[in-house]
Every structure is written in structure tokens, then in C-alpha cells.
């Protein structure tokens, strides 16, 4: 039994070390978080290389250019009663409706959705003591040929009767996205309520 656990504990330790290193690098040039604090009363630790791409009443989209693509962080809020019903069906439906309104594709009539061919992975967890639904999957653009990985955190904020939704997604065709998604996961997991 100890031999079968050894590789997993080593992997867990190396992931924690890698996460600490990622945070150290981010802290070399951190963002001031003013948009997130003013709009949603939250902060996350992310590098200043991310710039505001779209800012509306209840939606913020930040983007960082990378080799052959871009990394994206979006944030918005939803009322607490939004997740009634089967959560595994509601979260993709919410993502798709947000994509239709706020995240257009390159072509007219195209927009980001949750890929239908592969079911996302769902996890129930906590961030700083707050119930959180974590979803990992693949996004695609309806009516176009673009796709990539996403990670979505829906964090319950009972003090303000809402869900804070933080999502990271990457567009980088034909290259590995592992390190990009690791960075986005580290950033989103750093959320703090103000």
C-alpha cells in the first residue's frame, strides 16, 4: 500500500511547490486589482500583464497575450438562487448563456460555449471556507473552429447573497496548455473577499 501512495504524494508535493513558485513569480509584478475590488469586492493575485479586455456592469474580462494566443480571466456574479436544479446541467448552461452575451467569436453569430462532445469534470470544494463548484472542461466557439481548456470556479458568497464566478480559459492552437492552465488555476484559487 505505501508503494502505491508514494507517486501520488510526490505528485501532490511537487504541485504545491510549483504553485508556490507561480505565486512568487506573479508577485514580482502584481496587478493592483482595482477593477475587481470596485466591481465585485474581491481580489485575486494575478500579474499586471493581464489587461482589461471588456468591462460591463456585471462582467469583467481580462486578457494576457501569449505565444500563438491569449490567456483569459472572466469574472461576474449571479444571484444565489441561480444554481437550483441539477448543478452539472446548470453550470454549462450558465457558461453558454454568458458566452452568447459577452464572449463573441471571430465570425458573425459565433460565441463561446461548453464543448458538447466531452462532459466537463465537476468538483465540490471550498475556497476560504466558501462552498465552491469547480468545473474543468473544454470550450469551443459555436459556428467557428476554435476551442481550448477552461477552469470555472463558482464561489458562494452568502454575505452578499450571490455567487462569484471566476473562469480562466486559454486559446493557444497546437501547443501545450498545461502551464497556462496551471497559472490560471493558481490565480483563480487566490480569491479573497473584501
Regions found by a protein language model. Give the residues of each.
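Short, well-ordered beta-strand elements
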Residues: 1, 72-77, 162-171
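Single conserved hydrophobic/aromatic residue that forms the stacking wall/gate
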Residues: 2-10
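Hydrophobic alpha-helical segments and helix pairs
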Residues: 9-33
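N-terminal "mature-domain start" segment
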Residues: 25-54
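Signature of long, low-cysteine stretches enriched in small and polar/charged residues
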Residues: 103-160, 175, 189
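A short acidic/glycine-rich loop-to-helix N-cap element
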Residues: 164-187
Amino acid at each position: 500500500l505505501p508503494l502505491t501512495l508514494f507517486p501520488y504524494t510526490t505528485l501532490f508535493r511537487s504541485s504545491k511547490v510549483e504553485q508556490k513558485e507561480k505565486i512568487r513569480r506573479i508577485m514580482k509584478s502584481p496587478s493592483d486589482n482595482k477593477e475587481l475590488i470596485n466591481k465585485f469586492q474581491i481580489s485575486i493575485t494575478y500579474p499586471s500583464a493581464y489587461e482589461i479586455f471588456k468591462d460591463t456592469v456585471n462582467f469583467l474580462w481580462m486578457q494576457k497575450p501569449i505565444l500563438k494566443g491569449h490567456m483569459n480571466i472572466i469574472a461576474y456574479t449571479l444571484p444565489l438562487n441561480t444554481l437550483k436544479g441539477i448543478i452539472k446541467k446548470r453550470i454549462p448552461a450558465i457558461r453558454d448563456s454568458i458566452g452568447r452575451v459577452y464572449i463573441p467569436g471571430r465570425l458573425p453569430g459565433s460565441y463561446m460555449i461548453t464543448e458538447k462532445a466531452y462532459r466537463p469534470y465537476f468538483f465540490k470544494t471550498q475556497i476560504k471556507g466558501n462552498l465552491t463548484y469547480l468545473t474543468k472542461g473544454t470550450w469551443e466557439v459555436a459556428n467557428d473552429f476554435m476551442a481550448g481548456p477552461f477552469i470555472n470556479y463558482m464561489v458562494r458568497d452568502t454575505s452578499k447573497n450571490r455567487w462569484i464566478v471566476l473562469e480562466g480559459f486559454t486559446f493557444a492552437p497546437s501547443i501545450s496548455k498545461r502551464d497556462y492552465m496551471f497559472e490560471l488555476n493558481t490565480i483563480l484559487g487566490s480569491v479573497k473577499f473584501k
